[in-house]
């Protein structure tokens, strides 16, 4: 997730950048990196949805050790989150000056790093929060014996770790993970749009000090509803029995947890069927409601769908499916677009969106 986000943020790639994946085996730095399934080449979005180690390694190497290290620490790794609990671990990322080529390559898909589950979930929450990292906390308020609130904790933004555009693109690509073609299809929940990522990591063998070929951790992290996130869930299965893959053992557990939590938290369903657009705040503009069926039909016909009224996250999610680069002006909701709705896309390579903030 974070290597791709860093490369997008640095302008090195787009969701449709094609990465040569070497048919499943690639020698780098004197070692061979493998993919579970051999791929000839993949788009950036497919590197994520198909969990290509080789694709991620090539992207990380294009960033270089110092830049990749700097961007990983920006996401909150290698230092405590400062949650309101004692004894928190900072995790461990070796200094960039100690990274060899193979270290940069493997760090790009999460190997050779030590991060806590809390750090990982908080970093994914930054994607869900439009690029803003929020300090996690456990206790929301403290009450006296009479039930009076004597202290209340408010959500605290630490800072922006990626642009809203990068966060929106990452969300759209993470949604592809939870499709029939992605590795996280077993995390799909009827009526909800889920953005997520599977993980399968080798553990260190304490006897040899090298990565074990028998001991693994399987994981799935995701947030939902993807277009208006309210819940981040991380499931880690230590030394799973049978299948070792996150998509097989952790994704179903994510689904079970989410299906139990959604009704308890009062998070409504129906997001998969409909994108409810906002009223445009521009004087004289008409409110727009774009159904997913209408958008899908426009995409099938290779015509520009109507984006007015959508948030930046929603609009970029649609455009990523078209393979269009996008220039964004302003923040908030789309009030103007070029190409216009219904226009054919033959020969069109880019799109311009103008946004304005929602009126209170």
Please give the residue ranges for each predicted region:
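Ligand-recognition elements built from short beta-strands and adjacent flexible loops
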Residues: 188-191, 235-239, 243-248, 253-360
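Beta-lactam-recognizing serine transpeptidase/beta-lactamase-like catalytic domain environment
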Residues: 1-237
